[in-house]
C-alpha cells in the first residue's frame, strides 16, 4: 500500500496574480518571458503555457524537445530554447523555435546550418556571462560576434540576455549590481 501520494495543485488565479504583480513592477513596454522548462518544473509545461499563452510574450525551455511539445500543444507564442544542440537545429527551425547562442562554435554552426537550408534572418538570442560563469559569451567576444553576424544575412539578433547569479541574496547585492553593470556595458 502506497501512503506517500503527493499531489500538486496549480492555481490559475495565483499564476495570473503573480504575473500581474511582476508586470506592475516593470515598464509598460517590457516583454515577459515565462520559463516552462523541465516539464514546467513538475507542473506540466503544456498546461501552464496554454494558460499563459495570451498573457506573456515569450516562453523559454531548456531543450528543443520541450519546445516541440509546446508546438504540438498548439502554443504559437515564440519559444526560446536555452540549450540548443547542434544536432537539433533542423527541429528548432522546423518548429519555429528560437535558439539561445552562447558561444562562437554554436553561432558559427547555426549560421552554417541556416545557410545550407537557405534561411535568411532567423531570430537568435545571444547570452552573455556576467557572473554566473556557466554559459555565455564574454565582453571580449563582442567584436568577433559582430563581425560574424554583420557579414551574414542568415541570422538576426532578437535579444541579448544574461542569467544573474545570486540576485535573490541580499548579502550578494554588490555582486548583483556588478553583474548588472557588466550587462549594461555589453
Positions of predicted regions on the chain:
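Active-site-proximal beta-alpha core segment in soluble small-molecule metabolic enzymes
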Residues: 2, 7-10, 14, 30-182
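Alpha-helical packing segments of well-folded alpha/beta enzyme cores
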Residues: 15-18, 22, 186
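Conserved PLP-enzyme active-site core in the AAT-like
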Residues: 25
Amino acid at each position: 500500500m502506497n501512503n506517500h501520494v503527493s499531489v500538486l495543485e496549480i492555481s490559475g488565479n495565483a499564476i495570473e496574480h503573480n504575473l500581474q504583480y511582476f508586470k506592475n513592477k516593470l515598464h509598460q513596454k517590457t516583454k515577459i518571458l515565462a520559463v516552462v522548462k523541465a516539464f514546467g518544473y513538475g507542473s506540466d509545461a503544456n498546461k501552464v503555457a496554454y494558460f499563459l499563452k495570451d498573457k506573456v510574450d515569450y516562453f523559454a525551455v531548456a531543450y528543443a524537445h520541450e519546445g516541440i511539445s509546446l508546438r504540438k500543444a498548439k502554443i504559437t507564442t515564440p519559444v526560446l530554447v536555452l540549450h540548443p544542440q547542434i544536432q537539433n537545429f533542423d527541429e528548432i527551425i522546423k518548429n519555429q523555435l528560437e535558439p539561445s547562442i552562447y558561444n562562437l562554435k554554436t553561432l558559427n554552426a547555426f549560421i552554417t546550418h541556416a545557410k545550407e537550408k537557405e534561411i535568411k534572418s532567423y531570430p537568435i538570442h545571444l547570452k552573455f556571462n556576467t557572473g554566473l560563469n556557466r554559459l555565455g559569451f564574454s565582453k571580449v567576444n563582442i567584436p568577433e560576434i559582430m563581425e560574424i553576424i554583420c557579414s551574414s544575412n542568415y541570422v538576426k539578433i532578437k535579444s541579448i540576455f544574461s542569467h544573474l547569479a545570486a540576485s535573490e541574496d541580499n548579502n550578494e547585492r554588490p555582486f548583483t549590481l556588478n553583474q548588472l553593470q557588466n550587462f549594461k556595458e555589453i
